[in-house]
Amino acid sequence: MEFEKLANLFSKLETISDKTRKVQYIARFLKELKDQYKETLLLLQGTVFYPWEQKNLGIAEKGVIRAISIAYGIEKQKVEELFIKYGDLGIVAEKACEMRKQKPLLLKPLTVKDVYQTLRKIADIEGEGSQDKKIITFAKLLVNAKPKEAKYIVRLALEELRIGVGEGIIRDAIAIAFSVTPEAVEYAYSILLDFGEVVRIAKEQGEQGLWQVKLQVGRPFRVMLAIRARNVQEAFDIVGRPAMIEAKYDGFRLQIHKKGDQVWLWTRRLEDVTRQFPDVVNIVRNRVKANEIIFEAEAVGYDKKTNKFLPFQKISQRVKRKYDIEKMAKEIPVELHAFDIVYLEGEQLMKKPFKERRALLEKVIDEKEHEIQLSIGIIEKDDKKAYQFYQDCLNKGLEGVMFKNLNAPYQPGRRVGYMVKLKPTLETLDLVIVAAEWGEGKRSGWLTSFTVAALDKDTGNYLEVGEVGTGIKEKKERAEDITFEELTELLKPYIYKQEGKKVYVKPKIVVEVAYEEIQESPRYKSGFALRFPRIVRIRFDRSPKEIDTIDRIKQIYEMQRGGIHKQ
């Protein structure tokens, strides 16, 4: 398929604000799609990489400016002036393409595959002189582009497509195009993480095919998520009685895949951390009695001297570490607490009830202290006994407890009433930082006030819900402390615009934010604002696609209005 067709779709979607109309346009487009499903659907998501691929093109704005200059024979200074004028390098590329003095005699039509493969190729260029090679390769792609194509190729390269299309809209469009349910599309995508494959299955096999997609060892999936409960009674009301009540550990949730001696470790945000945890790989090889298995566990750091658990921020150092890995493994050892299993020796287990999955997990885990153990848990129906177990967990320094429906299947990628978490803290939200302000006086040189946003899952946009500057320290006194300097260094690479003291950053850094209540507010696009927000911690284990949604914020607000929600 010619890329021009996809660029025309992008252009149309960019002008439409109504979600229903966006869905209809994409559905019509998908119905006519004959091939190149993988490439087309990834580009529609504004990327050329699958969610589990830790890759990027490695071309920043300066490199794109050079590529535009080379491709269209325009002075670099002129390109920079256009950027100042329009503030969007996609539009700059479109204008520069229209302005070029010497057009190719034979303009070869670009295909979707051409664009996809070239952008992937750029990401793979490494070594000496790689930046120049990337820019030349990108410039060659732009040479063959028409103005509108150039606009979206540049935006794709910068991962800023700006067409207001997220997973929710794509899900609904696939459902309409092929007469299947959105639930079936979402289920299949949560396992495959490939909308191109989901489209192919929906087209060829329909609803039944989507519900029958299978997990593959060595390929990650989206894990099941918990909803929150405010007390023991509410937790039982959601999951039913009796329930499995398990300790909630303050660590990193891992999905662990094993095939023979090969082991893969992924975090919740689908980050491959196999290399960072050689000790965990050895534990799985030696203590998990299965040839092929996919299970979940919490990796928790502990202090060798005191035998006490370490705070989450301490173990997060290991996830970020790229060197001295063996040394770090000795300094911050971790142990695994296994809590669920979804695949064993060729058998798909997601549709089995939790009590059966737990029994299978118990059979394959060869427990050893400070290596791997099953999560501590009890089966209970009594409020008082459940509350006592909850208090016991808190007294041991654990984060809280999980209540689980004994008869529930495993629902990947969704917050459903099959498991809930109960913690003693204020209500918190996982949000992404989208803007900040430079400090003054002794805080000059640091970003000190942070604008946080929630996800509109349909459009993929991030809508602001407040500004927060508390919960952050000037000096690090404990391992779990967050400093202004630390947040500033994390955000600096993602600054893309500055207006006076305010900077705008790409939505990359996720923080957990506590608050007193949610209020309606015309100040923010979301229509809501957090009252007395405070940053609790940086969520290195959360991706921007996993943060709390606007729907979640609306839900909490409605609960408050009904007098149900009490802090």
Curated annotation (Swiss-Prot):
Active site per the UniProt annotation: K248
Positions bound to ATP: E246, R253, R268, E298, F339, R415, K421
Entry function: DNA ligase that seals nicks in double-stranded DNA during DNA replication, DNA recombination and DNA repair.
Keywords annotated in UniProt: ATP-binding, Cell cycle, Cell division, DNA damage, DNA recombination, DNA repair, DNA replication, Ligase, Magnesium, Metal-binding, Nucleotide-binding
Example GO biological process: DNA repair
CDD domains reported in the protein's UniProt record: Adenylation_DNA_ligase_Arch_LigB (cd07901), OBF_DNA_ligase_Arch_LigB (cd07972)
Record-level Gene Ontology MF annotations: ATP binding; DNA binding; DNA ligase (ATP) activity; metal ion binding
Catalytic reaction annotation: ATP + (deoxyribonucleotide)n-3'-hydroxyl + 5'-phospho-(deoxyribonucleotide)m = (deoxyribonucleotide)n+m + AMP + diphosphate
Family: Belongs to the ATP-dependent DNA ligase family.
Matching PROSITE patterns: DNA_LIGASE_A3
EC number: 6.5.1.1
Cofactor(s), by name: Mg(2+)
InterPro entries: ATP-dep_DNA_ligase, DNA_ligae_ATP-dep_bac/arc, DNA_ligase_ATP-dep, DNA_ligase_ATP-dep_C, DNA_ligase_ATP-dep_cent, DNA_ligase_ATP-dep_N, DNA_ligase_N_sf, NA-bd_OB-fold
Pfam family, one: DNA_ligase_A_C
Top-level taxon in the UniProt lineage: Archaea
Name used for this protein in its record: DNA ligase
